[in-house]
From Swiss-Prot:
Organism of derivation: Pectobacterium carotovorum subsp. carotovorum (strain PC1)
Biological processes, Gene Ontology terms: dUMP biosynthetic process; dUTP biosynthetic process; nucleobase-containing small molecule interconversion
Active site residues according to the UniProt entry: 138 (proton donor/acceptor)
Region Disordered, residue ranges: 169-193
Signal peptide per UniProt: none
Protein name: dCTP deaminase
Listed pathway(s): Pyrimidine metabolism; dUMP biosynthesis; dUMP from dCTP (dUTP route): step 1/2
Length: 193
């Protein structure tokens, strides 16, 4: 059962759930909290690699990822990031989220943006119990027109679901947690699997 607006506010009030900066009441609806777009992005460089062998040796996968992913782009205030049709880009929420060990979060895109072809997460929309950090967004433009994305715009909504008990292996205590405390648009770390 997902938390309703009253429960979300109660969890925020007593510090079990932390969202920084804390969202105002008008950004908390019946079962979700609106999140905004941050100013950090990462894109694929122009490259000549015919493919990335995801099951290949880790050092080769790592080298291939380094060749195709850009450095992080920090967009100055007031500027837009243009996502063209058929392009994938990584971005990050403005808000940082900390979940307790007995709560899982879910990220959903906004319907109004989806109707323009913008996918906010390609497949990864679960936020693990024990998560702490900003949420990376996997943008894909499946529409026909370039989309101007501006830091601070409402980009998605989080919902929260209590677990039957505290997780034995929450994300923040796992030794293999690849994105622990992430604050920027971190590229894939599949080579760390």
């Amino acid at each position: 059962m997902r938390l309703c607006d009253r429960d979300i506010e109660a969890w925020l009030d007593d510090g079990r759930l932390v969202i920084t900066p804390r969202p105002p009441t008008e950004r908390i609806s019946g079962a979700t909290v609106d999140v905004r777009l941050g100013n950090q992005f990462r894109v694929f460089r122009g490259h000549t690699a015919p493919f990335i062998d995801l099951s290949g040796p880790k050092d080769e996968v790592s080298a291939a990822l380094d060749r195709v992913m850009s450095d992080e782009i920090n967009l100055p205030e007031g500027e837009a990031f243009f996502l063209h049709p058929g392009e994938l880009a990584l971005a990050v929420t403005l808000e940082s989220v900390t979940l307790p060990d007995d709560l899982v979060g879910w990220l959903d895109g906004r319907s109004s943006l989806a109707r323009l072809g913008l996918m906010v997460h390609v497949t990864a929309h679960r936020i693990d119990p024990g998560w702490q950090g900003r949420i990376v967004l996997e943008f894909y433009n499946s529409g026909k027109l370039p989309l101007a994305l501006r830091p601070g715009m409402m980009i998605g909504a989080l919902s929260f679901e209590p677990l039957s008990g505290p997780a034995a292996r929450p994300y923040n205590r796992r030794q293999d947690a690849k994105y622990k405390d992430q604050q920027g648009a971190v590229a894939s770390r599949i080579d760390k699997d």
